[in-house]
Amino acid sequence: MPDPFKLCILFGDSPDRPPQQISPGWEMAEVPVGIQLDPFQSNANWAAKRAEIASWNLPPIKASSHFLHHYGLVATGPGVDWEQLEFWTKRAFERLHVLDVTTVGVYGGFFRVREGFSRVEAMDQALRFCNMLADHARLYGITVALEPMGDLDTLWPRYLDGLAFARELGRSEVRLMADMNYFLKLPQPLEDIAKAPEYCVHCHIAGDHGQPGVGDMEAIYLRLFRILKDIGYEGGVSAACPWVSTVGGMLDFGLETSKTLRYLRDLRDRVYSE
């Protein structure tokens, strides 16, 4: 039997969720690039941020998200600035490498077909940007995980659309992320993940307007976990989600991350003992 997938948590994406309050026991962490690494910040500022991140005593930081963030950064459409994207991407991968990140999530919402803009040209831009990502990823042995996100005005809204795009791109550094909630959004069968197991390198999960365990979604988690077990997936399954208090009052992030970890661990143990 393959090793189980790893339980991962996104950190540092909102001020009401202090990373230092994350409960122990999570097996890996996911860093939001544009928020915590901000490639437009000076290297001196980055050194201070690295020290701050180290002080949080997080699990190994192996994944990332929020690759483009603010500053007018776009990957498709009339507003693309290639010089800006090149600087951002180069420095982002340098900083991700320092943290020992191995999987870089890239959101499908960055690849919209803007109103009045040629879809063919947008696709050419997307291919150019993803080749740029792959070039920098190759330098550090990093894998890029494209995240189809269910919006029909994007170039690859569905997981299988993303798979076709990644295959057309033809770069071994570029694979896919499976986000459970975006599968549900259109909807799409989770079994699509198993059509090309080697392409799935990261997963996102959430609850019903909150963290996993909020709402009645246990059957869906179990279905996803069984698929991941069957394909031998050993990457991260990341709680990348809004967080709410399940006990009333202000959010106690330490309490909720501990509760969610126990919930997910119990479900995973159930699946891997079958």
Predicted regions located by residue number:
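Short, solvent-exposed loop/turn segments at secondary-structure junctions
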Residues: 113-115, 153, 184-186
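Catalytic-core regions built around general acid/base machinery
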Residues: 45-56, 126-137, 192-195, 223-228
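Structural motif corresponding to the early beta-alpha repeats
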Residues: 27, 31-127, 211, 233-234, ...
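Histidine-acidic metal/acid-base catalytic patches
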Residues: 1-27, 57, 83-86, 90, ...
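Short, glycine/acidic-enriched loop or turn micro-motifs at the edges of active sites
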Residues: 33, 150, 180-182, 243
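Hydrophobic, aromatic-enriched interface-forming segments
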Residues: 140-157
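A broad helix-preferring feature
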Residues: 62, 74, 172, 176-180
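Conserved beta-strand positions
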Residues: 31, 106, 146, 178-180, ...
